[in-house]
A protein has these predicted regions:
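Metallocofactor- and cofactor-centric catalytic cores in central/energy metabolism, strongly enriched
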Residues: 1-93, 102, 108-112, 116-151
Length: 151
């Protein structure tokens, strides 16, 4: 069974949707799902949610929660990123407010325009740290190969 690491699992709604999608497949329903986040409180919430989702799907996954990125990514078959560096407030709100202040319409703050640039500048350094860890502890993961190939 695969080991799937959810990076930023404290984004509970996003994690719930991803986990539910994964557990809906019999091939993935007994895998190991590692929930990783830097925020212990949000991680505990995500862990409770993961057990509820597994029960709802009548799935029997192994659920692990950790704040240690090396432990989370070690031997991972897949790593799914859902981090939001800086959080919703103040960062995402600012991503919309600054363009608006200068008369620019910000459509989708996480990928386009001025807000997308702000988010990229916050996120890329953190993602490079995870890519370095992945290169060491799960080099055969497709996520690892694609994240480090371009460097």
């Amino acid at each position: 069974m695969p080991k799937v690491t959810l990076i930023g699992a404290g984004s509970v709604v996003f994690a719930k949707n991803l986990l539910s999608d994964c557990l809906s497949y019999p091939e993935l329903s007994e895998g190991t799902y590692v929930l990783y986040d830097i925020d212990q409180e949000r991680l505990r919430t995500a862990e409770k949610m993961a057990h509820q989702v597994a029960k709802a799907w009548n799935a029997k996954p192994t659920i692990v929660a950790t704040t240690n990125p090396v432990e989370a990514l070690e031997d991972a078959d897949y790593a799914i990123n859902m981090i939001q560096v800086g959080g919703y407030e103040p960062c995402t709100v600012t991503d919309f407010e600054i363009p608006k202040k200068y008369g620019l319409r910000q459509t989708i703050g996480d990928t386009l325009g001025i807000g997308g640039i702000f988010r990229a500048l916050r996120t890329i350094p953190v993602m490079l740290e995870y890519a370095d860890i992945m290169e060491e502890v799960c080099p055969t993961s497709p996520s690892s190969t694609t994240s480090t190939r371009w460097r």
